[in-house]
């Protein structure tokens, strides 16, 4: 019978860095509220949560890399909102942010949770920031907690 390794959802004693974009702040602030809510509900102490506000989504990977390199955190949660406009800017930013965040996780060996919305409309972003479609910031924080614990169980 195989041995299964699963992470639990206990954030007690863990430290978290959160990188959040100021651009589209009316969305990103809801994502941040959701992430902090999830961490605290699962046992994290608010004093073990550090939030770095950055200008936009494109800057998320560098800020996440800097947080990961500081070795102060068990996981980093990335939050932002890229909403499609009438130019190709959406494709460039959303692609680079997702690749950059994945790269930081692989290079650092630290769980980096992706809570960056990439939506076609503002309405879709609002739905994913705490209304009809849940709160993706909350979900990213839960992912971070579980991933930290499963990685610890593997070692």
Curated annotation (Swiss-Prot):
Catalyzes the formation of 6,7-dimethyl-8-ribityllumazine by condensation of 5-amino-6-(D-ribitylamino)uracil with 3,4-dihydroxy-2-butanone 4-phosphate. This is the penultimate step in the biosynthesis of riboflavin. This is 6,7-dimethyl-8-ribityllumazine synthase. It holds the Pfam family DMRL_synthase. Pathway: Cofactor biosynthesis; riboflavin biosynthesis; riboflavin from 2-hydroxy-3-oxobutyl phosphate and 5-amino-6-(D-ribitylamino)uracil: step 1/2. HAMAP family: Lumazine_synth. InterPro entries: LS (IPR034964), LS/RS (IPR002180), LS/RS_sf (IPR036467). The keyword Protease does not apply.
């Amino acid at each position: 019978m195989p041995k299964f390794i699963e992470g639990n959802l206990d954030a007690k004693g863990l430290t978290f860095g959160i990188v959040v974009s100021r651009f589209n702040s009316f969305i990103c602030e809801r994502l941040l509220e959701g992430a902090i809510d999830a961490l605290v509900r699962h046992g994290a102490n608010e004093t073990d949560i550090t939030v770095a506000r950055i200008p936009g989504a494109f800057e998320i990977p560098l800020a996440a890399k800097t947080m990961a390199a500081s070795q102060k955190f068990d996981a980093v949660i990335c939050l932002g909102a890229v909403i499609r406009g009438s130019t190709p800017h959406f494709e460039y930013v959303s692609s680079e942010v997702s690749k950059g965040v994945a790269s930081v996780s692989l290079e650092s060996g630290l769980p980096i949770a992706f809570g960056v919305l990439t939506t076609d409309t503002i309405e879709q972003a609002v739905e994913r920031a705490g209304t009809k479609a849940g709160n993706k910031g909350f979900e990213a924080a839960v992912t971070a907690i579980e991933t930290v614990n499963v990685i610890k169980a593997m070692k």
